[in-house]
């Protein structure tokens, strides 16, 4: 009988396992199973386990293959475990690194032929187990570090998805055998039969029985080699939770790196003590050593969380410039590439191994033929079916190329990118259009629109006629009007319904799709630069491989939707010639080229310089440059292609030649300023370049151009003319606030300015009168960024300062849009969407929007000044001698007569130390219209200027009213002789309007009353300072001496007046007792002491006066050790005061030459010690206050002040470090010592002299990485800070390498 049974088993085929189980398995193969709407035919056995089989099944309708898991159970406990596995898989399905759940079904044991309950679980079919691929690769050598990084990162992403569930799902049986390789080459985690949501927290109250029960349950669901110390020894009372998956991941990483398990024998003692060893001589995987140690900690509390593991892997990937989400191509290449048919076919292990947890072990069987009885049992129908299956294997072997997962990526939840949806045979290597339709209909039923960017078309009915055909040409940037129209269309579709999504595709879902999606992200104001958008696309899908022209057109869109948009003009442009400097080396001898040019406008070729070979000029290196004359007028999208003409064998006789493309340039004329004469493109701005050796160093291409002054409107109005920018908000790109915050945390790094290697320049000459007529039509820049697209333009409009809205958050942008009016309709998406949150600037957490004008990195205009003169703007930097640019409070000044100060045309310096309250328009006879004292004058306001023009007494004094008032102003109340009329007279209206709008009035405390020298009192002060010479400004020494407050500081009460000796000065005399007016304007110049008197009591708190002295001869020195000439700055001779402000040391010496000065005699009285706050209300009005007591003066200071409120001080310190040195490896290394944390002594500062050659830079960079590498700071308080420094250095090093590792000189 046994012999007969063996014979039947032999005839049943090689798939038989023998006995009832084998017959059950064989009986199931070939059957048709219905799961929901799917009708599947079971084709063969893939694997078997303790109570489960895995089959390959094919959908009879679509031909798609699936993995069908058949689970058998005869116990209620097993039933619950199976149902739980199905529930977990269904809940976790959808993640790219977890096997996809499709369907499930079950029947009771009463209905089953096996007498057991049956459960069917349908999932996607993967290529095979990772173990088998690793074995094949490792036979040829160790696995590369990048491949291990991808494998482990994708595995951790799957575990992270499990741990993020509520409650967290713990896999408990993570091992390399449970990792599958998809047809696309990505990792898929499978087998959730051991997963649970229950955590255990043993303590001393647990009984031995309870510990034994828990240990038994855990042992049944885990693999011995991967068990954790807390599981092996429950009496350690460590918590048993998600950290057991971290331990298993550490074992997997160790196994991937060193091809052996850290606890190969599963010895409990070694596991409990964490005894494993990393090979000492390993240098290939050193980057993973610290990560392995951190994951294999005995105490689970000390192990890294899965989020920390993923973050460290991302940092390693960024440092190695690897996309960790990409397919593991090394495994696919070693195993036949993407074209392998079906999953890997491995030989079955002996007897089919089954572990203690009942997990499926590999038992794949090759079944190239069926058993003899299979044919007899199925009859002729089965025979022809098998023949049909065999004939279809050729197509199936090709169809498995990248099949199994659709090539579709979600940039956001509402923007998707995929490759071309193909039909027919082509669908074997591309997305099948039916699969795409089914996927989109299932996920976004009725709410998706497809945008086809490729020149090929297909039936729009496949996607319910919601297909937009764009037809963009390949290997060039799209036309601007087409790109802008596409962005408008996508925005309108997303606004219709908050459930709508946009699906964009070209042929491969790369360059063209990246341009469209990145431009749309910028159109919605998520980013303001192309670099940030392209980076997000690269991380969400793949590196797009775009050209500089693609990026240029994305920047065009950024400019057009900026806060102050730049609209392209409609002026034609004459391209005179193309100049290449130096001569490119395209000849066979590498000594020159024979170039010719083709120019396209849109799709039409407008000119070519191609001629017969001998008639085209050949340029040599000695020529220095190659010039191609053109003389063609273009407008709109311009494409210039430069070819090298090369003679072929026998070509001269046949008048034939071969052309070799050298490069091409594409741009839009609407963004070239009207006065540009030369457009310069660097080597990095050129498209379709050949090998770098053919382009000499500093190679650039210049277009000699001339922009016509008149507009030439196109036949059709461009789409941006009548487009309202209201309502553009980045939140339309997301489905909820959490998604937006996640995007900001990943891609919200502050956008970097343009890099030097990707900029071009524009030269221009003085504008002609015709050009000035159309001057206002030129696109204008709104940014102060030095690397702006139009930064170096010197247009006349730039007399008005640029007020770019730096760091404008989305919330601020929204408020601006709302403030524009209520005409914009709020979409349904915006009404139902999450509330907009303001983005807070950070080092790497948010995305502060840079100035709206920081665009067009590819083009910079270098334009000369126009013929129209420009009014100079007084800079605010340098020594502020008279406080002309300091800020102060605008306080109305009282009339001069109210203070009891007489009018005089001879008392030149009486108002030198008057309070600001004593200011009034001078009476007749005042030489310069003395209206305010030199030092204490109140600042001017625009209102004061208007009052002067209207003949009224101003509330505040304008120190430069004589300079600003017109000479023909007959309404001025002064009738005094105009002694300085010739050089003080100017047109006030022209002068005021010539200044920028933000400087229409002088700065608040621009006190220039040194020319207002009238109104000097005659009576000397009742208190005489102990000085042998008159010292008008002697009290200033007190400032320098007492700048640092001491214990003897004397508080100054409100309204108290101090002399230079520190004693309170009595109030001034009655106005009736003052000296009468003198006729000689300079008579009292030598009797200065007589012009000093007690000042009125209206002086602000903290005021003081200089020390007057008895009358001296006219030739007696009156100021000791003063500067040589009036108007120059000087420092009073006093004892050193290191902390004194520099502004307190620079003043005007109004009168007195060198020969008139003598030796200063010190005062007999002790000088007072006052605090720095005693003159708080005095100094701000005169420009002598410290800068830290004033508000920010510049936009940069305002941004820093805003950052300081919400940002970590360490991040602020890092931002200050990289400011102005973004991606400049030399600058960052030479200043690295300024940002290192306290106690770091391994780094020795380096200078620029140590960073001249690329070798020196590389050496210092490696030293710096050893110091700041985050792995060396694990667990330290400065760990996060070290990570930020490391990332900045790494970005700078990558940029240094991308630019060719050039030497400094």
Curated annotation (Swiss-Prot):
Active-site feature positions: 173 (proton acceptor)
Ranges for domain Protein kinase: 40-317
Binding residue positions for ATP: 46-54, 69
Listed Polar residues bias regions: 776-789, 805-816, 1111-1132
Keywords in alphabetical order: Acetylation, ATP-binding, Cell cycle, Cell junction, Cytoplasm, Cytoplasmic vesicle, Golgi apparatus, Kinase, Methylation, Nucleotide-binding, Phosphoprotein, Serine/threonine-protein kinase, Transferase
Principal location listed in the UniProt entry: cytoplasm
Name recorded for this polypeptide: Cyclin-G-associated kinase
Lineage of origin: Eukaryota, Metazoa, Chordata, Craniata, Vertebrata
């Amino acid at each position: 009988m046994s012999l007969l049974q063996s014979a039947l088993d032999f005839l049943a085929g090689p798939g038989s396992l023998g006995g009832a189980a084998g017959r059950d398995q064989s009986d199931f193969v070939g059957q048709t199973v219905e799961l929901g709407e799917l009708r599947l035919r079971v084709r063969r056995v893939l694997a078997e386990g303790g109570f489960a089989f895995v089959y390959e099944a094919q959908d009879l309708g679509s031909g798609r293959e699936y993995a069908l898991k058949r689970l058998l159970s005869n116990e209620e406990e097993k039933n619950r475990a199976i149902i739980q596995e199905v529930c977990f898989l269904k809940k976790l399905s959808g993640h790219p690194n977890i096997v996809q759940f499709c369907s499930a079904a079950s029947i009771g044991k009463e209905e089953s032929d096996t007498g057991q309950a049956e459960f069917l679980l349908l999932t996607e079919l993967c290529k095979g187990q990772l173990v088998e691929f690793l074995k094949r690769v490792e036979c040829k050598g160790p696995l590369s570090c990048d491949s291990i990084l991808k494998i482990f990162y994708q595995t951790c992403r799957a575990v992270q998805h499990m741990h993020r569930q509520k409650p967290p799902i713990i896999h408990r049986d993570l091992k390399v055998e449970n990792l599958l390789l998809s047809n696309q080459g990505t990792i898929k985690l499978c087998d959730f039969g051991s997963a649970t949501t229950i955590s255990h927290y043993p303590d001393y109250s647990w009984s031995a029985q309870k510990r034994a029960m828990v240990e038994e349950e855990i042992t049944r669901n885990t693999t011995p080699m991967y068990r954790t110390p807390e599981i092996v020894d429950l009496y350690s009372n460590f918590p048993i939770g998600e950290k057991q998956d971290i331990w298993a991941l550490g074992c997997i990483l160790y196994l991937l790196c060193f091809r052996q398990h850290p606890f190969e024998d599963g010895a409990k003692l070694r596991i409990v003590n964490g005894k494993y060893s990393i090979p000492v001589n390993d240098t290939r995987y050193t980057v993973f050593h610290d990560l392995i140690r951190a994951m294999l900690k005995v105490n689970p509390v000390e192990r890294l969380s899965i989020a920390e593991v993923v973050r460290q892997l991302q940092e390693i990937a960024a440092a190695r410039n690897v996309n960790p989400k990409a397919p593991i191509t090394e495994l696919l290449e070693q195993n036949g590439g993407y074209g392998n048919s079906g999953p890997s076919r491995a030989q079955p292990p002996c007897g089919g191994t089954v572990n203690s947890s009942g997990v499926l072990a590999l038992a794949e069987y090759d079944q190239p033929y069926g058993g003899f009885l299979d044919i007899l049992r199925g009859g002729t129908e089965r025979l022809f079916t098998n023949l049909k299956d065999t004939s279809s294997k050729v197509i199936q072997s090709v169809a498995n190329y990248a099949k199994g997962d659709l090539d579709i990526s979600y940039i956001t939840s509402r923007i998707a990118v995929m490759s071309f949806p193909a039909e027919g045979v082509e669908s074997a290597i591309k997305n099948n259009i039916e699969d795409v339709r089914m996927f989109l209909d299932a996920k976004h039923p009725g709410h998706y629109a497809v945008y086809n960017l490729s020149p090929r078309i297909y039936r729009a009915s496949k996607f319910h006629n919601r297909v937009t055909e764009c037809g963009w040409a390949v290997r060039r940037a799209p036309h601007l009007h087409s790109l802008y129209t596409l962005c408008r269309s996508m925005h309108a579709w997303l606004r219709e319904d908050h459930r709508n999504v946009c699906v964009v595709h070209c042929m491969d879902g790369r360059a063209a799709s990246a341009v469209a999606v990145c431009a749309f992200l910028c159109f919605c104001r998520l980013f303001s630069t192309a670099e940030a958008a392209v980076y997000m696309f690269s991380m969400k899908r793949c590196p797009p491989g775009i050209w500089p022209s693609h990026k240029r057109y994305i920047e065009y869109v950024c400019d057009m939707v900026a806060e102050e948009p730049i609209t392209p003009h409609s002026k034609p442009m004459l391209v005179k010639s193309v100049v290449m400097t130096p001569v490119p080396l395209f000849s066979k001898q590498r000594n020159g080229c024979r170039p010719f040019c083709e120019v396209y406008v849109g799709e039409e070729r407008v000119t070519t310089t191609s001629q017969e070979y001998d008639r085209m000029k050949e340029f040599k290196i000695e020529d220095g440059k190659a010039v191609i004359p053109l003389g063609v007028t273009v407008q709109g999208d311009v494409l210039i292609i430069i070819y090298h003409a090369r003679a072929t064998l026998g070509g001269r006789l046949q008048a034939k030649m071969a052309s070799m493309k050298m490069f091409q340039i594409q741009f839009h004329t609407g963004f070239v300023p009207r006065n540009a004469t030369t457009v310069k493109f660097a080597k990095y701005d050129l498209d379709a370049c050949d090998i770098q050796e053919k382009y000499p160093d500093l190679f650039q291409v210049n277009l000699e151009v001339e922009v016509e002054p008149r507009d030439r409107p196109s036949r059709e109005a461009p789409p941006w003319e009548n487009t309202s920018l209201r309502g553009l908000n980045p939140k339309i790109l997301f489905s909820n606030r959490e998604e937006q915050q996640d995007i900001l945390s990943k891609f919200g790094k502050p956008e970097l300015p343009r890099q030097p290697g990707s900029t071009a320049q524009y030269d221009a000459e003085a504008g002609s009168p015709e050009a000035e007529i159309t001057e206002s039509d030129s696109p204008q820049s709104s940014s102060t960024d030095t690397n702006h697209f139009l930064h170096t333009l010197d247009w006349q409009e730039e007399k008005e300062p640029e007020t770019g809205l730096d760091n404008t958050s989305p919330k601020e942008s929204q408020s601006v849009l709302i403030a524009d009016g209520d005409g914009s309709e709020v979409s349904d998406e915006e009404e139902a969407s999450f509330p907009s949150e303001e983005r807070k600037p950070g080092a790497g957490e948010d995305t502060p929007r840079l100035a709206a004008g920081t665009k067009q990195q590819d083009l910079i205009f270098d334009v000369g000044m126009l013929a129209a003169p420009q009014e100079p703007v007084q800079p605010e930097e340098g020594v502020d001698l008279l406080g002309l640019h300091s800020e102060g409070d605008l306080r109305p000044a009282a009339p001069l007569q109210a203070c009891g100060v007489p009018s005089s045309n001879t008392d030149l310096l009486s108002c030198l130390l008057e309070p600001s309250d004593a200011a009034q328009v001078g009476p007749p006879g005042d030489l310069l219209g003395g209206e305010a004292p030199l030092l204490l004058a109140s600042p001017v306001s625009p209102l004061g200027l208007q009052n002067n023009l209207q003949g009224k007494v101003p509330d505040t004094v304008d120190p430069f009213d004589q300079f600003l008032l017109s000479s023909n102003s007959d309404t001025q109340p002064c009738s005094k002789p105009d002694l300085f009329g010739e050089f003080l007279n100017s047109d006030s209206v022209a002068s005021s309007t010539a200044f920028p709008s933000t400087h229409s009035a002088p700065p608040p405390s621009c006190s220039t009353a040194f020319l207002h020298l009238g109104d000097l009192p005659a009576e000397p002060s009742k208190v005489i300072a102990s000085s042998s010479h008159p010292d008008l400004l002697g009290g200033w020494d007190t400032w320098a001496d007492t700048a640092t407050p001491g214990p003897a500081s004397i508080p100054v009460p409100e309204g108290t007046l101090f002399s230079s000796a520190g004693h309170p000065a009595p109030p001034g005399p009655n106005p009736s007792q003052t000296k009468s007016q003198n006729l000689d304007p300079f008579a009292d110049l030598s009797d200065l002491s007589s012009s000093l008197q007690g000042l009125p009591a209206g002086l602000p708190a903290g005021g003081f006066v200089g020390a007057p002295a008895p009358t001296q001869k006219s030739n007696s020195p009156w100021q000791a050790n003063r500067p040589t000439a009036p108007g120059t700055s000087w420092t009073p001779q006093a004892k050193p005061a290191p902390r004194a402000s520099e502004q307190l040391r620079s003043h005007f010496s109004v009168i007195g030459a060198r020969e008139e000065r003598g030796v200063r005699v010190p005062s007999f009285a002790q000088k007072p010690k006052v605090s720095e706050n005693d003159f708080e209300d005095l100094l701000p009005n005169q420009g002598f206050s410290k800068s830290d007591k004033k508000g920010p003066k510049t936009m940069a200071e305002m941004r820093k002040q805003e950052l300081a409120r919400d940002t970590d001080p360490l991040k602020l310190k890092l931002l200050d470090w990289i400011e102005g040195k973004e991606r400049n490896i030399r600058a960052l290394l030479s200043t690295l010592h300024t940002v290192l944390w306290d106690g770091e002594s391994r780094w020795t500062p380096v200078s620029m002299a140590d960073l001249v050659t690329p070798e020196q830079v590389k050496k210092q960079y490696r030293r710096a990485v050893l110091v700041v590498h985050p792995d060396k700071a694990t667990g330290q308080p400065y760990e996060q800070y070290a990570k930020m420094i490391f990332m900045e250095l790494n970005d700078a090093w990558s940029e240094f390498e991308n630019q060719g590792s050039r030497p400094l000189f």
